[in-house]
Amino acid sequence: MLERAGICAGVVLFGSMATHAQITPPSTLNRTVNLNYVYAAELGFGGYSLAGLTAQVYTLPLDYTVHDVLHDGWALRILAPVQLGLYSLKVTDTNGERISIDQQSVALMPGAELEIPAGKRTVFKPFAQFGVGHTFGVDAGSPNFYVFLAGARAVSQWHAGVTTISLGDAIIFAGDSPIGSGFSEHYVSLQLGLEVRHPLGFRVGSLAPDLGVYTIYYYYPVPLAFSRFLEPELKIVNQGEIGFSIGSATQFRWLGLSNPRIGAGFIFGGGLTVLRINFGFHL
């Protein structure tokens, strides 16, 4: 059965909640599948499949920015993302029995990010989030959990004509635990990324559409861990991501959002591949 043991930060992913799927037939082989919700929480909006487990996370990225907080030029982003996770485990046991388990989760991940200019090109962004969630679909273990993310990001920008080049890095500590007894987890992520944006050469009204392409390297000194039914635990130390986003080189607002972007990314390496929707270069 699926038992709550972890947490989620978005969905999958990457999020992550610590719910887990627990299959109980007696054997020396692994029959406990822990849903890595804390990875889902960081992932935000995407999904992956691994050893019979399919995970999908959908995040409504609500936030509000207050300008000139604590100091002129500083900004405070109030974060209130709402995350929905959909998980499906379909595996076959050693005796040929087919096992199918579905579970859902909902989490609220409030937090704050302080944007501190450091010179003309760089913005330093310490942040913290702490949220709670609830799982549905399996009547086992604690259905409630908490998840946390904390760390700092920094991004620097240069302009070469109409081209914008961004270099970003981040350090993130993330974890989750059930409210009550059960499985908990955490990991540390070091990230380094590069994005190049360039206008597409035409206008739509006042908008000047542009295309951004990016790459990000992930290093986990405390590895990502994914349990697998009847298989050894998968531990990931290195991953890469490539992706793109579309937006406008001119300033605009849409549905209350300032200069929104949307795109897609592909995360690979360490035995896990992930597809995600992004809302711009996320470092």
Q: What do the PLM-derived regions correspond to, one by one?
A:
Residues 65-77, 116-124, 157-165, 200-211, ...:
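Short loop/turn motifs that connect adjacent beta-strands in outer-membrane beta-barrel proteins
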Residues 47-50, 94-100, 136-142, 177-185, ...:
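Extracellular loop and loop/strand-boundary signature of outer-membrane beta-barrel proteins
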Residues 86-100, 201-283:
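Outer membrane beta-barrel transmembrane domains
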Residues 60-68, 108-116, 150-158, 169-171, ...:
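Residues on the lipid-exposed face of transmembrane beta-strands in outer-membrane beta-barrel proteins
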Residues 21-96:
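Short glycine/proline- and aromatic-enriched beta-strand/turn motifs that initiate or cap beta-hairpins
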